[in-house]
Amino acid sequence: TAAAARVGEECILRNPNHRGDEEYCFFLAVTFPASQLRIIDYNRVVRDLNGMTPAEFVEALRTDFEVEKIGGEVYRPARLHNFAMYLDGAWYSLTAREGTYDDDDPIGVLDVTVLSNRVLDKLLDIKDLRTSKRIDFVGGIRGLGELRRRVDSGEMKVAFALYPVSMKQLIDIADTGNIMPPKTTWFEPKLRSGVVIHSFEEGK
């Protein structure tokens, strides 16, 4: 959707006779009943620890999180504000401490916000999730094993799994006129690319 909007803006700039009813002014939208939607976790993998050793990074996390080492068995976040981390061959449970999130702020209470503010920005110096080459995103539909694989391969240094955003959180954000942070939700069912094509060329 964001990409379609950007393309539309580019087309407007290239068209000196823009009217507002051209095909590039529109994009596909679809509605599903909330009861038939499933929101899956959207996870993060990071290429480096910003100069820290694994031990130093774990120690730095303790300021804002209760840290428990789980070991080799895959750990899935159990509730809101609980995260799974895979680092140096082991899984950890990270539970955000009180004061790291704002229950009265529909954006500030999101786990993606907590992780971005307290870990990615504060410790790893990743300021912009959209442009940083040091971070990548893995849809939960691919499983936690994919996070472990990418770290064990040496491609990434650490992985974080998040508890899925609830439908209530999503609706609260929409109702207050806010915008979800990038890479927050993975919806199922997901429309397949190319099934429906909207041509920008007039008359097609």
Residue positions per predicted region:
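Surface-exposed, charge/polar-rich loops and edge strands
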Residues: 1-204
